[in-house]
Amino acid sequence: MGRRQFLLALTATGLIRPSQGQQQKLPLLAILSPASRNAQVLGFVNRPFKEALAKLGYEPGQTIEIVERFADNDESRLPALAAELVALQPRVLFTNTSAAATAVAGATRTIPIVVGPAGERVLIELAGVSLARPTANVTGFVLTSAAIDSKGIAMLIEAVPVARRIGLLVNPRNPGMTDYPAPQNAALGGSGVTFVRLEATGVSDIDAALTKASAQRIDALFVPDDSHLAANPAVRERVLRFARGARVPIASSHLTYARDGALLAMGPSIPVIAARAAGYVAKILEGARPADLPIELPSTFTTIVNLKAAKALGLTIPQSLRTRADEVIE
């Protein structure tokens, strides 16, 4: 039995009690969520994170105290909420998305921060030069990068070889996408594909981006993972509705897209990353520093192919792609 499990067992049986009139002080973990308290996306991040933390012996109210703040999808609130959490002097801060990570890192340079997950470019900037050995107080896990998106686009080209104009739906406020489609041109320049940059920040301007997509006569659409676009159910529904009406194949690095009706998706599993982030939090609570914990790139990817969507589009998915799929939707 590990030390954490041993302490938890003693606490549960009453063999360890705070002295009379004195409350036992538990380590404090602060969590900043950019979404609302009941947002669907938290089921992919906060829930698996907390479940993994509990398996490691950190039960809220018993062996750890957890405080949470929610920005309700308003990024302008993140800096104030981050400062509010830092004022509580937690042992560790946990957050996700590039915007939230930037806000928390801007609020403290001393309290350890675990990010699970965020974009590669932002984590490099926050951690300080080296992913392998962070020099700042930030460590965590990469979800998105230009290289990951280029792999997904290559898969889309394999599935739709006649596509010559591919739209890239990007959030101009996402630092990891400021130079798209330059990385895709570099990685896939020999494919004969022209990329069309389509910008949207959320529900308010997604329709304008889709109108541009129609005017530009794109043959296919790729949606990189972004908390305001790919991970936003309302935006996702409008994009998929557009695709059905225009008969445009869609791929994404956000796995839910394929399950909701896109042709395919390829990317890392957010719940797996969140669970691994819990392991980093546990190690910091036990004395590790962010510098001891390298920022991890995704090592495993899930590929989903939606044959139902392919049939509706009149497409035949190559057998080579079907056999590589981890999940096939009939």
What spans do the regions from the language model cover?
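Short hydrophobic alpha-helices and adjacent helix-cap/hinge residues
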Residues: 1-330
